[in-house]
């Protein structure tokens, strides 16, 4: 399956390498300690209360001056983790993996080198910003920003690089860009 030919063509091994490192990144996410600053009434705690209210079917709870102080994007991300029965860390790592894959896929129309694409994917997958304490290790809305930035830029780059192609090839990238930007706006 992954046996190199005499020419040392390793392109058949690349999907296995990608899968191995993606699983490794997800497993690493399970071992990363996460923290929440529960005393931050209008930051961390509010986002978790909003997620709980969404789960309870109360939308964003009782309406007061702080109901719309934060966007609904992060509570929806927490709700998605709950509904999919996935640990938060796994969903966060999957967001980073999907963002990395989409970014490489967006560039693939112009950049055909499979080794370079694999290297870029791995660099984005293990990006230091996606593992730092102040951003992703805190259970706060900033944790999903690195992955969502990749998704948003992937959609824009993918659409731009395919502007000469038929509409059928552009449409998935246009939809991705629209949905990603709408969700990204709600992270605020």
Where are these regions (language model features)?
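Start-transfer (signal-anchor) and selected internal transmembrane alpha helices
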Residues: 1-30
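Transmembrane-helix signature of polytopic, membrane-embedded enzymes
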Residues: 16, 103-129, 146-147
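Helix-to-loop transition at the C-terminal end of transmembrane segments
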Residues: 24-45
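Short hydrophobic/aromatic helix or loop-helix immediately within or flanking a transmembrane segment
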Residues: 46-54, 60, 64-86, 93
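Multi-pass, polyprenyl lipid-linked donor-dependent membrane glycosyltransferases
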Residues: 69, 91-95, 129-157, 183-187
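Transmembrane-helix motifs of polytopic, lipid-linked glycan transferases
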Residues: 88-113, 151, 155
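Membrane-interface transmembrane helices that cradle and orient dolichyl/undecaprenyl
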Residues: 152-172
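Membrane-interface alpha helices of multi-pass inner-membrane proteins
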Residues: 172-188
């Amino acid at each position: 399956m992954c046996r190199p030919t005499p020419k040392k063509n390793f392109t058949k091994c690349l999907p296995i390498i990608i899968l191995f490192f993606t699983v490794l990144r997800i497993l690493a996410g399970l071992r990363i300690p996460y923290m929440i600053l529960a005393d931050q009434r209008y930051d961390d705690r509010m986002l978790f209360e909003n997620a709980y209210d969404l789960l309870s079917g109360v939308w964003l709870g009782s309406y007061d001056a702080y109901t719309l102080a934060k966007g609904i994007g992060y509570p929806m991300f927490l709700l998605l983790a709950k509904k999919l029965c996935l640990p938060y860390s796994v969903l966060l790592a999957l967001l980073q993996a999907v963002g990395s894959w989409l970014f490489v896929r967006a560039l693939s129309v112009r950049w055909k080198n499979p080794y370079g694409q694999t290297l870029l994917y791995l660099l984005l997958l293990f990006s230091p910003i996606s593992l730092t304490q102040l951003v992703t290790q805190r259970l706060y809305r900033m944790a999903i920003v690195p992955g969502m930035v990749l998704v948003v830029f992937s959609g824009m780059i993918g659409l731009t690089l395919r502007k000469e192609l038929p509409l059928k090839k552009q449409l998935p990238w246009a939809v991705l860009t629209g949905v990603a930007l709408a969700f990204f706006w709600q992270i605020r």
